[in-house]
């Protein structure tokens, strides 16, 4: 999904926006009892989920613009530090009535910098 001035979403293994990895992980955000101070500002990555707070799997979204109403309700986990022009380009693409891009959009390269911290695998539920 691509919603200009809000976010771009990816990570569906089927490419439909409805798929997942076959498991779910615990939602790491304050309304679910997990301290997570990262705010949903432009460039922040967060886990997409269904209504169930523990339903995230492989889908994620990147904030195109600030969305403070998501703070504490979704598991923000990273931030775009280079290449925000690519996020902006995707956010400006033409979409259909379901917010799906008219032309396929792909992230060609992504690097995750953990700054030497070894994070445990998320708890599956």
Task: Show which residues each predicted segment covers.
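Cyclophilin-like peptidyl-prolyl cis-trans isomerases
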Residues: 1-125
